[in-house]
Amino acid sequence: MNIVKLQRKFPILTQEDLFSTIEKFRAIDLDDKGWVEKQQALEAVSKDGDATYDEARETLKHVGVDASGRVELDDYVGLVAKLRESKTGAAPQTTFNVAPNSTPIVSTAATGLQHKGKGTQAKIIVAGSQTGTTHTINEEERREFTKHINSVLAGDQDIGDLLPFPTDTFQLFDECRDGLVLSKLINDSVPDTIDTRVLNWPKKGKELNNFQASENANIVINSAKAIGCVVVNVHSEDIIEGREHLILGLIWQIIRRGLLSKIDIKLHPELYRLLEDDETLEQFLRLPPEQILLRWFNYHLKQANWNRRVTNFSKDVSDGENYTILLNQLDPALCSKAPLQTTDLMERAEQVLQNAEKLDCRKYLTPSSLVAGNPKLNLAFVAHLFNTHPGLEPIQEEEKPEIEEFDAEGEREARVFTLWLNSLDVDPPVISLFDDLKDGLILLQAYEKVMPGAVDFKHVNKRPASGAEISRFKALENTNYAVDLGRAKGFSLVGIEGSDIVDGNKLLTLGLVWQLMRRNISITMKTLSSSGRDMSDSQILKWAQDQVTKGGKNSTIRSFKDQALSNAHFLLDVLNGIAPGYVDYDLVTPGNTEEERYANARLAISIARKLGALIWLVPEDINEVRARLIITFIASLMTLNK
């Protein structure tokens, strides 16, 4: 390396500085490759005291590191030089624009990292991917979510040695770049979602390249969507580039999904005690988990003869009074009402959390986030309380509510159709498919999303501003319009009337939604059809069979109802034809037992997601040969392969 050339390029560094920096680079470039990974460079700089990890991380964004993400000697020297500029007061190169009358920033680093506010308002502002854009990271959310990951993944056989991650830096986002931590987090929230054997793992201490990391990111994003996470504008490159606000949002969605998954009357029959006097079980089951949590919270407040109620996870809990009563109800012996006598809100919040600690539930919240009314952290805290200390009397056998069990196929399809409708960004999101479609509004939104311009909203009865339900008569007008639209678009809707949707007829509702989803698939695949028309099931089947042959395999099926599909061999062979080498047949079992068939199906789903396919079904749908859902699996592969 030409020292003179480097000194001209980075005049802020003396010759002595340059020699020292080069030696430090060589100390971490043990194999003399001429480059190191970003993580190594950041750790080296922060260890030397040249900057904090986060300052070095933000500054590196302004150094011309190439697409490989590897830090070469020139880049490393550039990083050190920019950090030196920030300390000597040289004019920083920043991507931040501050309006003349905006709130003053408490501290601004020339690295482009801004700390704004403190205590309850502590936030970090980081540069966006576009010049002039910024994103805000809530420090307490980042810290608590990092603690959660450290806790649930501690001892993991694959990544446990990486933990714990520092809770006071942005290192978490760098650790998430290869998709492995996020995959493990998804499996913690919803076990068995990802077959980790399909993930790309580092070998011989070498980090994954960008392509391998992007495949892992595909699995993460598509799996998160499939378990019901709201994943908007997050792409594989966002993960591998460590974009903080997007990764933090994704982490929250995954944690939230896991925390709320146990708020289910089938798992907790004692939730039946939360029904109000004039409420039916069917109405109660329509509530989203957050509303059930609020109902649970208020049940305990009512049992305590407390005069307040909570309607949110922010201002209604921010003074700590309602939490004091709740914890006292859950365990009067351990959790006293003494915090009510404390007037200072921060002191009271600390006392509340000390009570929670006695229940081994001091998690997610800090005094400052409690007083600030952080809705995410308060929701997580209350969900954790419910999951560990529901405090409801067990239901006796004679009291047990009759929870209607409709046919397994209908339940499976309802789950997939709910996820699909929510992926269209319908508003409000669908919680209970058959109940939420009764007024026709979600159906009509879905028609418009799938076939823009199809719906004349002048003919649609909307809900009043209060959010109250519309009358049965108006709901019938909407659902009749939805059925008429379907017929006009060529759907087979023999015997289906609007009243069937309003009355919650499950079979007929599923039939209508399936045809709408099928049309959505067909529109996406039209470019694949030589005629430009909708593709029939037989054409889709022929395409799948051609892929099997192309991959040198000979499995066959007669239709999408063929029981031979149950062991997933055919689907794995289709994947092999699309992407040779992606199916490791050493991992494929004969499929003689239920466990083997499940393992094969999970393997097929994970490989499809790795390739970038959005797969809604779960392994049981394949094992039980749910024909419609298997068609969606093949159709996703077709759109991927076009």
Swiss-Prot record:
Superkingdom of this protein's organism: Eukaryota
Stretches for region Actin-binding 1: 125-394
Function: Binds to actin, and functionally associates with actin structures involved in the development and maintenance of cell polarity.
Gene expressing this chain: SAC6
Keywords of the record: Actin-binding, Calcium, Metal-binding, Repeat
Ion transport keyword on record: no
Annotated stretches, region: Actin-binding 2: 395-642
Residues that bind Ca(2+) 1: D29, D31, W35
Extra information: Present with 3510 molecules/cell in log phase SD medium.
Domain (EF-hand) ranges: 16-50, 51-86
Annotated GO MF terms: actin filament binding; metal ion binding; protein-macromolecule adaptor activity
Domain Calponin-homology (CH), chain residue ranges per copy: 139-259, 287-390, 411-521, 534-642
Name recorded for this polypeptide: Fimbrin
SUPFAM superfamilies listed in its UniProt record: Calponin-homology domain, CH-domain (SSF47576), EF-hand (SSF47473)
Positions annotated to bind Ca(2+) 2: D66, S68, R70, D75
GO BP field: actin filament bundle assembly; actin filament network formation; actin filament organization; formin-nucleated actin cable assembly
Any single GO CC term annotated in Swiss-Prot or TrEMBL for this entry: mating projection tip
